[in-house]
Amino acid sequence: MSNKSLAGEHNAQTILVTGGAGFIGSHTCVELLEQNYNVVILDDLSNSCVTAVDRIRELSGANADQLKFVEASILDREACERVFSENDIDAIIHFAGFKAVGESTQKPLEYYWNNVAGSLVLFDVARNHGVKNIIFSSSATVYGEPEMIPITEECPLHEATNPYGETKVMLERILTDFYRADSEWNVVLLRYFNPIGAHISGRIGEDPKDIPNNLLPYVAQVAVGKLECIQVFGNDYPTPDGTGVRDYIHVVDLARGHVKALDFMGGKVGTGKAIGLGSIEGASTEYGTRTGVAIFNLGTGTGSSVLDVIHAFEKACGKKLPYKICPRRPGDIATNYAACDKAREELGWVAEYDLARMCEDSWRWQSNNPNGYKE
């Protein structure tokens, strides 16, 4: 079955967003609805909350009726079949998956089963319904310890240091193999760096189920009084202040990158040339018929240290935050930030928000919702 064209107007297109109730997914759904797309969320709520869906509708105003929500796992073939049978899906933005690095080392079977086997169920059903347009939520973890800074899309992939990262590498390779076997596949791999921040309204944001694994939500929970002290893992790295440096990107900037990627897939921006992954090249650049595998880093292109983040958050919340220096964690690297030239040139996308704004928006979300989506 031939692939769907993405050449039409946004309001004539329906995007399936797996994991759309999650942190990045919810912000992406808001941006899609703002751009007048029809959106179907498929989410089993294992890492999220239905309240997020209600708030997406709230933020979408007059376009709220263009959103549908289906509570189901990507492993549920019958549910996936119903989604495609009952909705004229044009493209998929695939966020769904378990995502805790530490947990993945303790539960590798569950991670490979859910993230890889579940994705294969989704891809198979999509192909059977003639949908071969996929934006995949990948990660900078696929680069491992980088050989150069800033990291470009041409940097080689390294063996992941944990099962979560390995699922990202595997799915990138699987989608690339699909295109090698069938040139109708239209795939964009978005490699995120470190998404933080929240919607400016303070109505949606990051809501970890347990003690946060990532720096910013941990800092925010210390600021709101839920946790006692920030742990800084290592202050002897070869960086300006000795703490690890990462590329933090506002989640709204990241969400807008997905909208730009849809335009790119439809031939509406960029040259349509696929990049990275060896000999893979875009097969077509005609309007609405671009195919191939394209890879883009989404970051700001600048690095901020752990102490930079803590001090920026102190300014946002107006209080000093306690922190203690702890030993380095195994596998952590000193510096990691992106080269984003290709996203600018091919997608017409540039991150707009700085670290101060990320912290301000995160604090607004956390202070307005100290218990996340729990009332």
Region roles according to the model:
Residues 1-198:
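N-terminal Rossmann-like NAD(P)+-binding domain of SDR-like oxidoreductases, especially those catalyzing
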Residues 50, 54, 193-214, 225-246:
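Short, flexible, glycine-rich and Lys/Arg-enriched loop motifs at helix boundaries
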Residues 55, 76, 144-145, 153, ...:
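Generic structural "secondary-structure junction" signal
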Residues 72, 84, 111, 159, ...:
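Pocket-edge positions in alpha/beta enzyme catalytic cores
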Residues 106, 147-148, 156, 169, ...:
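Short capping/connector residues at structural and topological boundaries
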Residues 112, 161-169, 205-213, 217, ...:
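Short-chain dehydrogenase/reductase
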Residues 215-375:
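C-terminal substrate-binding subdomain of Rossmann-fold SDR/epimerase-dehydratase oxidoreductases
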